[in-house]
């Protein structure tokens, strides 16, 4: 008799992806600067650890928030009791104002339109449950975050159809790519319910420009489908062009089609911008009352604790702090990104130009033995197990071109990043030396064969000439 459910035993979780296998390798041999200096450095984790000191400084100056007090009096019992899963009004108000602040206050958000979830993972899955049936499809531009194979598909039964983007235009979405993805879904007899984009992009570290967003809006309008804009990296934009939210474009186009207004949904989180993934704070923002109502009911399976909401409502309500934090955090991200990019360039490795995120999209196509994904995985294994760096291969992100890798830079100390770059540079130098040596040996072998063939032919000619002379002498 079958003891477990089909859901428990299905293979759609994506656990066998090289993205997760790299994590396993790291967990079995984690780098530590003193206890395990030769261990694997984790560069596959998109965490922002660069500004903890700013958060800790605020906490030290605001002890009531951290100790669950209001005006010096304990509110522990109030927070410890069951809370309505709609969320604390003070926190929802502070959160939507913070979201607007990150977007330069070009758009505003209504607290009643937001649904709190236990992180962006929960938010994206909840939207799948709200907008699609099992067997329906969402279109996602490649490369995309490897975790989406788990977050969007595993429990919902929703299918992902890739919108294939290429390096020829910096992996931007094109009209032809959108239409081809839609046709691919139809060929598979899948009903397309929407498009999901990450902006800024994970893994590219780039922002979508207004033209690209309008292209997507034109597409979803013509097809009558939804748009989910995952904007969890919106506060990490450290360079130009700046960040343009889907809500900003929607506001500009709202007079064209009222129905589209209800079919655009934003996913947000404090995991990346504030560096608080352990707090599990995510959100869905939608202009559709039915989506908000349904998502709110579903959020009871993944609530944000009252203690977390209370602490963060105080922090995000401190406008002087949030403005200063956003600016300083972006400066630190820019500095760290430059450190990685310049270090890789010295090793002969280039990156896609980026202006956001906690990672770079690194081009190692020239290090592959062939232009096949098998060659990419072989290179990845060497980098993980021989070099000791866990990075994410492009194939795990469904990239169409072998040889691209996502490399994170904000989840480690500066000294650890420098060590990682030195390791990679040494590996590339050795790889090139080996390749050059192999080519030289190959060339020498060819030369020897050529000389041998020439000598053999000369011997045959000499023998033939000698034989002719003997024949003539005999005559």
UniProtKB/Swiss-Prot annotation:
Keyword Zinc attributed: no
Q: Which cofactor does it need?
A: pyridoxal 5'-phosphate
Q: Which GO terms describe its molecular function?
A: 1-aminocyclopropane-1-carboxylate synthase activity; pyridoxal phosphate binding; transaminase activity
Which biological process terms from the Gene Ontology are attached to this UniProt entry?
ethylene biosynthetic process; fruit ripening
UniProt catalytic activity: S-adenosyl-L-methionine = 1-aminocyclopropane-1-carboxylate + S-methyl-5'-thioadenosine + H(+)
Enzyme Commission number(s) from the entry: 4.4.1.14
Fetch the CDD domains from UniProt.
Answer: AAT_like
N6-(pyridoxal phosphate)lysine-modified residues are 272
- Claim: Lyase is one of the keywords in the record: yes
List all membrane-crossing ranges.
none
Q: In which pathway does it act?
A: Alkene biosynthesis; ethylene biosynthesis via S-adenosyl-L-methionine; ethylene from S-adenosyl-L-methionine: step 1/2
Function in brief: Catalyzes the formation of 1-aminocyclopropane-1-carboxylate, a direct precursor of ethylene in higher plants.
Please state which protein family the record places this protein in. Belongs to the class-I pyridoxal-phosphate-dependent aminotransferase family.
Cross-referenced PANTHER family: 1-AMINOCYCLOPROPANE-1-CARBOXYLATE SYNTHASE 9 (PTHR43795:SF10), BIFUNCTIONAL ASPARTATE AMINOTRANSFERASE AND GLUTAMATE/ASPARTATE-PREPHENATE AMINOTRANSFERASE-RELATED (PTHR43795)
Tell me the protein's name: 1-aminocyclopropane-1-carboxylate synthase CMA101
Task: Please tell me the species this chain comes from.
Answer: Cucurbita maxima (Pumpkin)
Gene that encodes the chain: ACS2
């Amino acid at each position: 008799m079958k003891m477990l459910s089909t859901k428990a035993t299905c293979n759609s979780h994506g656990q066998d992806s090289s993205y997760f296998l790299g994590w396993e390798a790291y967990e079995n041999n984690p780098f530590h600067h003193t206890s395990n200096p030769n261990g694997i450095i984790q560069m596959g984790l998109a965490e922002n650890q660069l500004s903890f000191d700013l958060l800790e400084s605020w906490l030290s100056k605001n002890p009531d928030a951290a100790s669950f007090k209001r005006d010096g009096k304990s509110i522990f019992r109030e927070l410890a009791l069951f809370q309505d899963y709609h969320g604390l009004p003070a926190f929802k108000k502070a959160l939507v104002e913070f979201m607007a602040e990150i977007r330069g206050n070009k758009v505003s958000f209504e607290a009643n339109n937001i649904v709190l979830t236990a992180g962006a993972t929960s938010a994206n899955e909840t939207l799948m449950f709200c907008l699609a049936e099992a067997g329906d499809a969402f279109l996602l531009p490649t490369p995309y975050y490897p975790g989406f194979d788990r977050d969007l598909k595993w429990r919902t039964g929703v299918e992902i159809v890739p919108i294939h983007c290429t390096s020829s235009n910096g992996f931007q979405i094109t009209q032809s790519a959108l239409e081809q993805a839609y046709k691919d879904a139809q060929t598979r007899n899948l009903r397309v319910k929407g498009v999901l984009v990450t902006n800024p992009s994970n893994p590219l570290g780039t922002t979508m420009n207004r033209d690209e967003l309008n292209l997507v809006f034109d597409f979803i309008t013509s097809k009558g489908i939804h748009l989910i804009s995952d904007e969890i990296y919106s506060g990490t934009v450290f360079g130009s062009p700046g960040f343009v939210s889907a809500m900003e474009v929607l506001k500009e186009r709202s007079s064209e089609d009222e129905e589209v207004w209800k079919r655009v949904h934003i996913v947000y989180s404090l995991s990346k911008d504030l560096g608080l993934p352990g707090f599990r704070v995510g959100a869905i923002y939608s202009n559709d009352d039915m989506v908000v109502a349904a998502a709110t009911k579903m959020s009871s399976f993944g609530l944000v604790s009252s203690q977390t909401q209370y602490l963060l409502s105080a922090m995000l309500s401190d406008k002087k702090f949030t403005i200063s934090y956003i600016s300083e955090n972006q400066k630190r991200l820019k500095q760290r990104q430059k450190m990685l990019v310049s270090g890789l360039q010295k090793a002969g490795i280039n990156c896609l130009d980026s202006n956001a995120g906690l990672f770079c999209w690194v081009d190692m196509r020239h290090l592959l033995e062939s232009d096949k994904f098998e060659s990419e995985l072989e290179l990845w294994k060497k980098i993980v197990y021989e070099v000791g760096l866990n990075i994410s291969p492009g194939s795990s992100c469904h990239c169409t071109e072998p040889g691209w890798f996502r490399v994170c830079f904000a989840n480690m100390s500066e000294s650890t990043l420098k060590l990682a770059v030195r390791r990679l540079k040494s590996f590339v130098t050795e790889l090139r030396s080996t390749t050059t040596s192999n080519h030289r040996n190959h060339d020498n072998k060819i030369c020897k064969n050529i000389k041998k063939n020439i000598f053999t032919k000369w011997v045959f000619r000499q023998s033939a000439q000698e034989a002719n002379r003997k024949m003539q002498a005999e005559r």
